[in-house]
């Protein structure tokens, strides 16, 4: 396994670690600035992965669920993020020495793009939960930064 693939795996586990710490009812929490609720943020993360897989390697889409707004559950999100995470991992693993179709400049930048995009949404999720009076516990807050144990 390459360092890039391992980095992606850690990042995906952190997304799921956060999701597991959120009560199902709080998936509907919304930040003061509106936009997507917590569940829709996680759904967006999954669906953007699918969008990129469709461009870069459509064969990796087989069996991957797109999460629609009216079908958001914690279980569905965890399953979808695990499955799409494995597909992105495979895409990165197969592209380490080269390029990702439809993305410039290379696979390392693609990984950086994904981690930046999804971390941005993790921040929005944390803010929405806090502003709604449902912040995740302190152990989880610190745990998001413990890449060496995730």
Where are the regions that the model predicts?
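Helix-adjacent hinge/juxtasegments
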Residues: 54-55, 59-92
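Short, low-complexity N-terminal intrinsically disordered segments enriched in polar/charged residues
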Residues: 1-2
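Acidic catalytic patch
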Residues: 91-104
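Short, contiguous alpha-helical
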Residues: 5-19, 24-66, 103-150
């Amino acid at each position: 396994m390459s360092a890039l693939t391992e980095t992606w795996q850690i990042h995906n586990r952190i997304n799921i670690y956060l999701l597991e710490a959120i009560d199902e009812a709080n998936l509907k929490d919304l930040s003061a600035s509106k936009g997507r609720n917590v569940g829709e943020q996680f759904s967006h993360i999954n669906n953007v992965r699918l969008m990129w897989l469709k461009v870069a390697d459509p064969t990796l889409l087989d069996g991957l669920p797109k999460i629609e707004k009216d079908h958001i559950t914690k279980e569905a999100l965890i399953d979808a993020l695990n499955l799409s995470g494995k597909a992105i991992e495979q895409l990165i693993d197969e592209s380490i020495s080269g390029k990702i179709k439809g993305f410039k400049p290379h696979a390392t930048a693609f990984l950086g793009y994904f981690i930046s995009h999804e971390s941005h949404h993790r921040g929005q999720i944390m803010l929405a939960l806090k502003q709604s009076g449902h912040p995740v516990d302190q152990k989880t807050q610190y745990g998001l930064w413990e890449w060496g144990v995730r």
